[in-house]
Amino acid sequence: MDTPISASNQTATVVKPQQPRRVLACVLCQQRKIKCDRTFPCTNCVRAHVQCEQATRQRRRRFPEKELLTRLRLYESLLQQHNIKFDPLHTPTADHRSASDDGRDDLPEGAESEGTFGEREKPAVKTKSLYEFGSCINSLISGRLILVNRGDDDGNNGEDDEHDTGFLHDTDDVRPAVIQKAWNHTFQGQNNDHLLFGSPVGTVNLSASHPSHVHIFRLWQVYLDNVNPLLKVTHTPTLQTRIIDAASDITNISPTLEALMFSIYCVSLLSLSDEQCRALFGSAKKELSTGYQFACQQALRSCSILRSSDRESLTALYLYLVSIRPDTDPASLSSLLSVAIRIAQRIGIHNESTYGKCSALETEMRHRLWWSLIIFDNRICEMSDDKTASLAPTWDCKVPLNVNDFELQPEMKTPPAPNNRPTEMLFAVVRSELADFVRHSAFHLNFTNPSLNTIATRLTDETAQLVSLERALEEKYLAFCNPENALHFMTLWTMRGSLAKSRLLQHYSQCSNTSVPPTDAQRNTGIAHALRMLECDTELMTSPLTQGYRWLVHFHFPFPAYIHLLQDLKKRPVEAHADRAWEAMSDNYAVRMMDASQDDRPFFIVFSRIVLQAWEAREKMAVAAQLETPPPVPPRMVVDIRDKVMQMTASFGMDAAAAVESGGVVGVKAGDLDMPMQMDFAAPEMAYGAGGHGATGLEPWGCLDMAGPAAGDVGANQFLLNTMEWNALHARDR
């Protein structure tokens, strides 16, 4: 009975016996494309009375990594025997820290990307075979269990010989290419793309769905101005040439490029207002978006996106998902993003061990795409269900390099050296490095997946580490930014706001680990972080420099900052920070919600009650004090909310009755607008608010009061947020 063959190499002394050389089909059988019995001379040549010429083996395309590793281990063992210090390729197993040393498991090899924050303690390395076990293909062939390792083969396992006939003989090795080819042929011809986009309605002529040449280049320019600087998932020098060629021959565009072009149309329109769309293209934004999104779906079907292993097809899917975000329920979009992430994992862009054959350009574009995709997914999960986020220490894709697109050429074998000054990658790099820190942090994992804390980087003092991270980012990138440059301005204030959000989350994590009520000093620390979040967001929303980037700013509504401030103001209405807090909220409210549309009504109803309760606490305290001074002047935000509530109260009765009949709102009456409410901030439905612009999901913010189970209580009524069918109400209002 055959025994399983392991692909792992855990020791330096065990070497597998050499496999017998494969006998290739003879030259004549290859030319005639018939089966050769691989004897010499073969039966076919004997029967044809011709000379049988044995084919020569093609040169191996891949370097024999296994032989190199074996020799390297031998040299390392010799150095160890002679007590010569050196840096080993892999840390010996004996040097590993046990789980009992620090209470957590070690991080797999390479599982931490190389970011700015180099002061973090990097855990020891486990054996290579354990980490790469997930990359093995388990196949039961001829009674033998074959463990095929993607990154450790004999240099020829991944490819067939060019002239092989494809038949498997007794002397053949079972290679990954053979297994994969057989598996692919099993499902050949089965198109399952309808599972994602539905069955096509008749024949769709995609060439007729493209805009005119002038509009193609206008959309491309909008993409370069508004979208590309923030996402950086396409390589402008090479893609622009292809788009110019494609525009000159619309009917002969490859399916992958066509899908990418339509996704660029879609995401470009996302960054424009309706007035800009009418001025540039003579049509309404909604009309254009609907048409291009439908065409993009058909183009993605044409390139078999669900089976594709092409990075550019995945980029097209990602841009399409970004474009539909404002009008899509976050829970639904999260499900679609899981498909995109699974495709990315099948390609292997999350795993550095799969990059061996990639050029420098392809490697960098994969890094950029993975980080952009994961950060987008994390934000969507904040709005729906944090526990499904993929921002975790379970993969090892490196942070993108701080290099310009023109520094990356297709023929380059090695990547260029990163710049020490801001480049066009500034926003994407800084955002990725901050996300790289967060994904290893306990304050993030405690809310998303606490079990992953066992493999996260151990930080002795996360508060101090956050300060060090901010200092590192400031010194390496932000100190050289020009605030008059739009991208630099966007990077400065986005990162400062994101750091404040991380500090607030870390503050909650600390307070939730103790049953002792927070002190006033601790409360004031949280207030400072929340104020910083609001002030940074207001800077982004009011500056004319960010006009083209406003589509992404809308995506990050600072709802946790509002809730934190209002919670505190309700309990401490006359603290020293009260006036500053009301002013900061009023400034942000003026640019965020002063002109709220009908679509925002569900969110506004809830938000208005939280605000009015906090201000009523201030007024009640003034009355109770019986001061002779004039009553406090309501902030601008309170005045506007009261006006809107009065307008809504006059017309809300009929709308509420209709909603109750349809099951949209449970137990909501017109009078509820004037009654205090109790909010369950752990309800995921709340994250849908802000009219599609994206309120932050509140599950990780459930300990806003940090004082126990009643932390989410902002009122005294029986009305719970999770009794409202937000999606049904939103659909009715639209």
From Swiss-Prot:
Name residues in a coiled coil.
Answer: none
Q: Which Pfam families match?
A: Fungal_trans (PF04082), Zn_clus (PF00172)
Its subcellular locations are: Nucleus
Basic and acidic residues bias: start-end ranges = 86-107
Q: Which PANTHER family does the entry link to?
A: UNCHARACTERIZED TRANSCRIPTIONAL REGULATORY PROTEIN (PTHR31001), ZN(II)2CYS6 TRANSCRIPTION FACTOR (EUROFUNG) (PTHR31001:SF45)
Q: Where is this region: Disordered?
A: 86-122
Q: CDD domains in the record, alphabetically?
A: fungal_TF_MHR, GAL4
Q: What does this protein do?
A: Transcriptional regulator; part of the gene cluster that mediates the biosynthesis of the tetrahydroxanthone dimer secalonic acid D.
For this protein, the record's InterPro entries field holds: Sec_Metabolite_Reg, Transcription_factor_dom_fun, Zn2-C6_fun-type_DNA-bd_sf, Zn2Cys6_DnaBD
One Gene Ontology cellular component annotation? nucleus
Q: Molecular function terms in GO for this entry?
A: DNA binding; DNA-binding transcription factor activity, RNA polymerase II-specific; zinc ion binding
Keywords assigned: DNA-binding, Metal-binding, Nucleus, Transcription, Transcription regulation, Zinc
Give the DNA-binding residues.
Answer: 26-52
Q: Write down the PROSITE patterns for this protein, in alphabetical order.
A: ZN2_CY6_FUNGAL_2 (PS50048)
Biotech and industrial use: Secalonic acids show unprecedented anticancer activities against various human cancer cells and might be interesting for further derivatization, targeting diseases such as cancer.
Q: Which GO terms describe its biological process?
A: DNA-templated transcription; positive regulation of metabolic process
Please identify the protein, giving its name as recorded. Transcriptional regulator AacuB
Instruction: Output the superkingdom of the source species.
Output: Eukaryota
Q: Principal place where this protein is found?
A: nucleus
